[in-house]
Swiss-Prot record:
Textual note on the cofactor: Manganese or magnesium. Binds 1 divalent metal ion per monomer in the absence of substrate. May bind a second metal ion after substrate binding.
Span of the signal peptide: none
Protein's name in the database: Ribonuclease HII
GO biological process, one term: DNA replication, removal of RNA primer
Cysteines paired by S-S bonds: none
Function: Endonuclease that specifically degrades the RNA of RNA-DNA hybrids.
Organism ancestry: Bacteria, Pseudomonadati, Pseudomonadota, Gammaproteobacteria, Aeromonadales
Origin species: Aeromonas hydrophila subsp. hydrophila (strain ATCC 7966 / DSM 30187 / BCRC 13018 / CCUG 14551 / JCM 1027 / KCTC 2358 / NCIMB 9240 / NCTC 8049)
EC number: 3.1.26.4
């Protein structure tokens, strides 16, 4: 059940992926969909198969009026904390749009500081098509980065757990220690470094 969006305003949707993982960037995306060129099958990226996400990823990039990916690094996450780093990454995604939106819908319960009107929408990735599109761009982008990290460090299993603190990942982290891409402010990483 999607929320009706005012079609007289240029609207962007923004979502993030990767607040919970112990490693890598928090990745956000901003998308302005084209009402004249709808995309069928948009939904929260977590509810879609990987195959469907990849197909929609290409379709979104092709059909959207504008799209942008923003991120915050592990160093920024450690310096700012994960919430503030996520807000920064969202600001970067909106700033990267080739067209400035008049209204921005953000998934969740708080908005970053933006130069245009912004509204937080709880469960927005299931309610606002542009947020669904943003969630797909962010998730496919971040998953690809974890697959690439896995190719450099296969012993850590990043392609399987995507950096999330699964039992397998925590055991590997305790045994091998963190790589530079880890978020050193996160408790399991601090524990592995012997500073918790």
């Amino acid at each position: 059940m999607m929320i009706d969006i005012p079609d007289d305003r240029l609207v962007a949707g923004v979502d993030e992926v990767g607040r919970g993982p112990l490693v890598g960037d928090v990745v956000t995306a901003a998308v302005i969909l084209d009402p004249a060129n709808p995309i069928i099958g948009l939904n929260d990226s977590k509810k879609l198969s990987e195959k469907k996400r990849l197909a929609l990823f290409d379709e979104i990039k092709e059909k959207a009026l504008a799209w942008s990916v923003g991120r915050a690094s592990p160093a920024e996450i450690d310096e700012l904390n994960i919430l503030h780093a996520t807000m920064l990454a969202m600001q970067r995604a909106v700033a990267g749009l080739s067209i400035a939106p008049e209204l921005v819908f953000i998934d969740g319960n708080r908005c970053p500081s933006l130069s245009m009107e912004a509204r937080a929408v709880v469960k927005g990735d299931s309610l606002v098509a542009a947020i669904s599109a943003a969630s797909i761009l962010a998730k496919v982008t971040r998953d690809a980065e974890m697959t690439e990290l896995d190719s450099r460090h296969p012993e850590y299993g990043f392609a399987r757990h995507k950096g999330y603190p699964t039992a397998e990942h925590l055991a590997i982290l305790a045994e091998r220690g963190p790589l530079p891409e880890y978020r050193k402010s996160f408790k399991p990483v601090r524990r592995a470094l012997g500073i918790e």
